Structures are given as C-alpha cells and as structure tokens.
Amino acid sequence: MNAVTLAPGSESDVREILLSETEQLHIAGGQSRLVATEKKIISTSQLNGIIEYEPGALTMVAKAGTPLSVIKDALQKENQQLAFEPPEMKHLLRLPGNSTIGGVFSTNASGSRRIQVGAARDHLLGVRFVDGSGRVLKNGGRVMKNVTGYDLVKLMAGSWGTLGVITEVSFKVLPIAETQATLRINSCQASILTQAINTPYDVSGTFYDVGLKLAYIRIEGFDKSVKYRVEQLLREFSDFEVDILEMEESKKFWQNMSDLKFLKEIKGDLWRVSVKPTDGSKIIKILDPKISFLDWCGGLVWLGVDQGFDVREKMKKVAGHAMCLLGNFDQFHPSSTLEKRLSNSIRNKFDPKMLFNQEILN
C-alpha cells in the first residue's frame, strides 16, 4: 500500500485540508484495524493528548489521536477504566499501529463487558469533528444529562470515518471492580450463557469455546458480593463440573480475550459475525466452522473457516452482519437497499463532496 499520508497537527489543519481537498480520502487513527486502501490517508495520530480528566466526575476529554494505551494508563492510576473493554486488533492482524481513542469510538469497538454496561457508543458523551465541507461541529457534552446533539453523537460512534474527521471525544469512565472471579463450566452447551445472564447475579462477561464445550462466566464487584454470587451460580450449575478462576487468573483470562489472543491459532479465513444472541448457536450449526467462539451471550460469533468459504452466502437466512477480518472477501457486510438510501441521505449532509472512506461504504 503506497498511499500518501497526511498527519494534521491541529483541528485547524484538518479543516484546511478538507476545504481544499477534492480527491477521495481515507481517515485513519493508529491504523491498527485492517482497511485496505490506496487513497490519500488523513491520520489523526498527531491530534494527541488528554485535554481534561475529572476522576470524581467519571469523565475524560481527549484528542482523537491519543493512543488507547495512554488513556488506559491515566485511568489505571485512578483505579478507573473504559468499562466497555475495547478490544485490541493489532496483534491479531499483525499490524504495527496502536489503537487510538478516536478509532475506538469511530469503530464502536466493544468487548465482553458489553452485555452489562453497553457498547462504546453508550459511553460517548460528546464529539468534535470536521465534516466534508470543512465545518467544525460539536455535539453532546461532558456530563450524561446533557443530551444536546445526542443522536449525532451516537451516529458518529460506529461511523468508521464516513461522516467526518473526529478531532476530540468526551466520554464516561467507571471505577475498576474491587475483585472478580470467573466460573469455567466444562462439557456444557452454549445455551448455558443465556441461563447465566438470566440469573439475578449480574454477570459481566460470557464466553464459549464451541470446540472444547467450555463456558466462562465472569462476576465482578465487592468481595463479599462476588463470593455470594459465585456460590449461587455454583448451585445453579451444580449438574456440571465447574472450576473457579480467582481474581488474578480471571483478570488474565479476560485480558487475553480483549487482546483476541484466542484467535491466533486460526488457520484460513477469520470472520466476525454479529447476530441476535439466540442466533449464535444457529450460525454454528449452519456453517459448521473449523473453529468457533461465542461472546456477548451468543451475539458475537468468531469463526475460523477454510480459505474462500463464503460465510455471508451461507448465513443468508439469519439476520446479522458478517465482517471478514482475514480473507479475500470484502471486509464489510453489504448494505441493503434501504440501508444505502438512509446512509446516503445522512452522508449528503456531512460529506457532499464524497471524500471520506468510500471503500467502507462501497
């Protein structure tokens, strides 16, 4: 890939570029997620730094190109976290870049705790961005009750850089739980994830290894509460062989999940499929993949299949979105006619020159 990269150092620089540019562009953060392009790249890597952090208010404001690792380090010092556990793709995709906080929200990157606290977009409070006409727009605020521009904030989360160049984000953070434990349930079916999430014991993570028939159920909170809920879940699953991963072992396991290390052994093509939680097992039965895992209580399916196996063609009868991460298929799931119409309507308002990330929209 021999694309020219522009790295503006300020929001004003971004605006100047967009006012004068007529050729299609690709917006990138730390380039830690795989999107093939030969277009000129606008990198936000120089829009870097934490602008404001109020631990007591559970909010942070940062420039979009701030590395995710810098955000995490600052939060760790105050025993706080990005509760939605944004996953790191760079190790899996063997890319040199580092995830940025703007990239996290632009791709709505959300980890296992999504089932408890929501996705990345649910933690985004406000956003500044420059649209395709060179307008600097700001929506949302730094506190949850400020809902000015609420819909646009949510729209930018998960837009993959198709509506504008995000320059600044404000978001909520949460305290790190006092302790955690994970139940590892042996020789079980995937339906046990739903059984666990439907208990009153506030499960914060579920994961299922289809090949090994192993389920992992995470509990977090205050020490006494975690011990009580673990005891109750042991009773709930008394018909199964259950091991307990105590705090450090549990933390290590879920960190490996966030780093996607469980996918490193996959040979062939790698797919990430989002469906209704009740359809996760159905996808496995239809596709019969070589390797598969379930997250989000079955709503997120990771698939390792033979090279050239068309997952989208096989899953046509199941509503969902299949992204090809490693393979020779288009990375993004094709949009329906209605989705394209709605997307184009929104896009015309923010990018009338059709500058941004065309390879994603197409």
What are the roles of these predicted feature ranges?
Residues 180, 186, 192-245:
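A conserved active-site cap/scaffold subdomain adjacent to cofactor or substrate pockets
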Residues 2-89, 309:
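Glycine-rich N-terminal segment of FAD-binding domains in flavoprotein oxidoreductases
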Residues 92, 240-362:
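Conserved glycine-rich FAD pyrophosphate-binding loop
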Residues 184-189, 217-223, 273-277, 303-307:
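Short beta-strand-to-loop capping motifs
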Residues 84-85, 94-206:
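FAD-binding subdomain of flavoenzyme oxidoreductases
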Residues 5-8, 24-29, 42-43, 62-64, ...:
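General beta-strand structural signal in soluble alpha/beta enzymes
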Residues 69-70, 189-194, 224-232, 279-287, ...:
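Short, conserved charged micro-motifs
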